[in-house]
């Protein structure tokens, strides 16, 4: 189960995510990110498990300027692999 804590300060919004993130959570994450913040930070320190759709979502977020902090190593490596596979197609 995903838990989201939202903190806003000035033009920055930080979403602290914890638990398991599934593809069914992506719409809620988009909704939480849809504000007037210039800078959005996703803090993944307490994320325990993700699926492939979430990895693609995180990659797209990062490509769009969202900052990923405390990204678990396995998630970072998976993002890199997904990008490499996407570049080959």
Give the positions of each predicted feature.
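STAS-like cytosolic regulatory interaction modules
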Residues: 1-89
């Amino acid at each position: 189960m995903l838990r989201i804590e939202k903190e806003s300060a000035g033009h920055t919004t930080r979403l602290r995510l914890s638990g398991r993130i599934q593809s069914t959570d992506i719409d809620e994450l988009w909704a939480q990110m849809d504000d007037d913040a210039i800078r959005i930070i996703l803090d993944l320190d307490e994320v325990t498990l993700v699926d492939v759709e979430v990895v693609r979502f995180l990659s797209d977020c990062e490509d769009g300027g969202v900052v990923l902090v405390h990204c678990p190593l396995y998630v970072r490596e998976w993002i890199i692999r997904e990008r490499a596979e996407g570049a080959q197609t």
